Structure formats: structure tokens, C-alpha cells
């Protein structure tokens, strides 16, 4: 049965759900209009300064970014949508291939209702086999295959988008965990100063205004803590939505490979970036459509067979009462003139190809800009980290001096409160700076198409689709 079916219908390709990156990336990008991509780094060092980037000790329940990304891509509905579209497009290839196979049709008709033949019924069966068409069917198949490659590239784009969304959420969640910890320390520190101010005011050592001022600072720090906790909970809820379970008791880990495998000091491979692959696939679709339009000018040769049986009346094919007739013939057909539509379609296809090529260049330019922005961010954040660490030491020493001077009465409680705030402000800036570096790195990983390598998604079945490097 399977062998017989293969004679009359095309065999579907069951490998559409395996994305071959070598095949998708088998093209060159013309970057002559732009400068070369920058290699991020400084002339003095070939390593990223990760001082101060150590994480909280893991607890009994720890998840890292790679594990979270794998969970998210397995359940994200937009990836499901793209994969369903991929399967649909694979079926469209079979639709195009069907033109290679015999086309059977049949029906029953009556005679001319305005003549004496109106009582005739004619049963007919027709078979048509395309013999030669100058490659028109092949061009239709090529269009559908190019669209399949485009759909595969769009699946990769969506996987990278989800991976970036998860990684960015984890980085920001870790950021606000640290910021909330520092904000709580600030509340505790100011509360201690307020307690001391109350004791001194009650003892008559200092002004009664000191406790009021301390209370104002305490309330401001408490308000800041609530604001930071709100941001933390927002990212917790975002991750909960992406992963599908409560993540409040999970300790998130940012693995070192986010830094080491981001290849921040290496030029990216442009033709392996999903957005570039998608744009190039659109070029291939436009080229195939142009080829199909050009071939539509040529004739098609078909082998046509017919069977007809008059059920009542005369068979018009042989003029016999209740007659049976059969015939086999060659038939050549061509569209000679359609009001200039073929020429217009050819021009439209040419413009579509140029537009698709421009989209490749635009995608490259966007990537170029993003990488250069990341270069500046990472370079300056590393320089800023050194200043912030020095400031942290200075503010700590300042607070110690102000405490001694406050005891001696040469400093006001406001000076002491400002010193306390300065310490925690410096600590917050260090943490924000640290996680800004991480945020830029995960953005770079996505921009340069390295998400599948860094988060170990290659050769992993993602909702039935496997990415093969």
C-alpha cells in the first residue's frame, strides 16, 4: 500500500523539525558598506574584570540560567506557534510536489439545456500527467522550501528571544535581591542612629530636633526598601509566568560561562545569527518567486487521458447512443498574453528581492550598533567599578569619623545620617553596576546568536524541534 501510494502522492519530509544550522548559515553577508564589527575589550587587558561578581552561596534549591531557559523554551506558546507554522509550511512543500503526480478528476454532465440534447447525461473521468514544464513545478517547490527555511530561522529567533527574556529576568531578580538586602541594612543602620538620637535627646545631650530628623530619614529608607521589594516581586512574577511555577524559594545562579562563553573578545559569526539567517531566507524566497514568474512565460506539456460513458443519450465524443469513448493525447498549453501581468509580476519580484537584501543589511547594521553599544557599556562599567569600590572604602571611613565626632558633639545627627546613607548608596551602585555588566553580557549573547551555545540548547528537542549545529 505504501509503495502504491508513493506513485500517486509525494512523500512528506519528516526532517523539517530538525534545524540544520550549517545549511541555514551557508551564505555570505556583504558588509562592505559598513565598518568591521568591533571586538569588545580594552588594549590593556584580554579578560573581563569579574572582581566583585561572585554570587551568593547556593542553597538546597538552586537553578542557573541555562536550566531556566530550557524550562521556558519547552512551554512558551509563541515557540509552539512558530513550530506549528513550521509544520504547516512543510505540508505546503507536499502541496507543491503534488503537481509532479497524476491529476485525476471526474464528474457527470448534462447536454445543452436549450436544445434537444438536454436529457443527456455523460459520465467522464480525466487523468493528466505533467510531462515537461521548463521547471515551473520545481520553482514552486523551491519557493516552499525557501519559506520552510525562513520559518526555521524564525523559530530560532523566537527561541533566542525567550532565552534573552529569561536570562534578563534572572539577572534583574538577582540585582534586586542584593539591592533589597542593602536597603534593609540601610533601614537597620538608620534605625540604630534614630535610637541613639532619642537617647541623647532624652538625656538632654542633643537637640530635640535630632530624633525628628532621624525619624524622617528612617521613613525615607523604609519607603525605598518597599520600592525595591516591589521591583523584586515584579521580576519574581515575570519568571513565574515564564517558567510556570513558584520561584520565590529558589536561589538563582548566574554561571561563569555567561562571562567566559559570551566570546566578548571575539568577532561574531554573522551568518549564524538568527535575525540575519531569517533576513537571508527572505532573500531566497524572493529569488525563487522571481524564477517562478520568469518561467511562467514558457508552455507546459501534459499527457491527457479521458474516459467517457453516455448514461442517457449520445456520447458527443463518438456520436453513439449510450456510447463509451476513451482517448490519450499530448496537450501543450501556454499563456500568451495577460495584459502585461507577467512582466509586472517579474518587476515586483525583483523589487521584493532588493527589499529583502536591504533587510539583511539593516539587520547587520542593527547588530553592529548593539555590539558597539555593549562595548561602551562593558568597558565603562568596568572602569566605574574601580571608582565605586574606592568610594565604598571612603564612605565607610567617613562614617567611622563622623560617629566619633558626633559623640564629641562636633557633628550633627544629619551628618551621621548622611554618612550612613552614603555607605548604602555606594553599595547599591556597586551591585547595580555589577548586574549592569551581566545584563549587557546576556544581551550580547542574544545579539550575536550565541544563546543556543551558552545555554546548551543545541541538539535539545524543543517542543519537537531539534537544533543541529
Language-model features, listed with the residues they occupy:
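Acidic, low-complexity, intrinsically disordered peripheral segments
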Residues: 1-35, 55-57, 247, 429-469
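Periplasmic alpha-helical coiled-coil/stalk elements that build and connect Gram-negative outer-membrane
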Residues: 26, 158-272, 374-377, 381, ...
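Regulatory alphaC helix of protein kinase catalytic domains
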Residues: 40-71
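Short, solvent-exposed, mixed-charge loop/turn linkers that connect secondary-structure elements
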Residues: 48-49, 56-58, 226-272, 300-302, ...
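Small/polar (Gly/Ser/Thr/Ala-rich) solvent-exposed segments
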Residues: 80, 103-119, 131-157, 277, ...
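Amphipathic alpha-helical coiled-coil segments
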Residues: 81-96, 158, 162-187, 192, ...
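Membrane-embedded beta-strands of outer-membrane beta-barrel proteins
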Residues: 125-127, 330
